[in-house]
Regions:
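GST-like domain detector, emphasizing the conserved glutathione-binding G-site
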Residues: 1-130, 135
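GST-like fold's C-terminal all-alpha helical module
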Residues: 85, 97-188
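Phosphate-coordinating loops and pocket residues in cytosolic domains that bind phosphorylated ligands
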Residues: 43, 81, 186, 195-196
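Short, solvent-exposed turn/loop segments enriched in Gly/Ser/Thr/Pro and often Arg
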Residues: 7, 151, 197
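Conserved beta-strand edge residues that scaffold enzyme active sites
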Residues: 34-35, 177, 198
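Terminal-tail/helix-coil boundary detector
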Residues: 195-203
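A generic structural-conservation signal
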Residues: 29, 147, 172, 193-194
Length: 203
């Protein structure tokens, strides 16, 4: 059985929990206190971070790597495109999300650190601008890739859920994106994947 070491408030762990519930398979989630991590976390992941996936003698870390492995191991429902060209494009989009959005999410996750106010405001503004630029896609598309739910939707969902929590308010121009977010939030797997700590993040 797969075991996922997951932070109860960690957006990256949230991605992996979401995929596991979408697949509807047997797995175990072990909650990790992000402020008091057990020693074996550093043994399994030299960067000392969660999520970590363990299956027999395989240990994986980094949410996108974990999720692609789960998708290949349990291909139904398929979340990565079957075509190599489309799959490569999705990987580029995932990389873009990390560089353009989630580097700033990481700053916001550290917002309890004093003296970081300017960086926090800059990150909030950058996320707001990038999401607003993305909004017109959803005037036509149900999901990132059209009608089909995919790994791109999984990757961005934890950020969209945390907008209130991070103090990011989007303008009316982002209305199509917010409707798209509600479609994701209504998925049974998304609801199941939420921890009690995450449920209270959104008004």
């Amino acid at each position: 059985m797969m075991v996922l070491y997951s932070g109860t408030t960690c957006p990256y762990s949230h991605r992996c929990r979401f995929v596991l519930f979408e697949k509807g398979m047997d797995f175990e989630i072990r909650d990790v206190d992000l402020y008091n991590k057990p020693e074996d976390i550093a043994v399994m992941n030299p960067y000392g971070q969660v999520p970590i996936l363990v299956e027999r003698d395989l240990i994986l870390y980094e949410s996108n790597i974990i999720n692609e492995y789960i998708d290949e191991r349990f291909p139904h429902p398929q979340l990565m495109p079957g075509d190599p060209v489309d799959r490569a494009r999705v990987r580029l989009f995932l990389l873009n999300f990390e560089k353009e959005l989630f580097t700033h999410v990481s700053v916001l996750e550290q917002r309890s650190v004093k003296g970081n106010e300017k960086a926090i405001e800059k990150s909030k503004a950058h996320i707001r601008d990038r999401l607003t630029q993305l909004a017109p896609v959803f005037l036509k598309n149900k999901y990132m890739l059209g009608d089909n739910f995919s790994m791109l939707d999984v990757a961005i969902a934890p950020l969209l859920w945390r907008l209130d929590h991070y103090g990011i308010e989007l303008s009316k121009n982002a209305a199509p994106l917010l409707k798209y977010a509600e479609r994701i939030f209504s998925r049974p797997a998304f609801i199941e994947a939420l921890t009690p700590s995450e449920k209270v993040m959104r008004k």
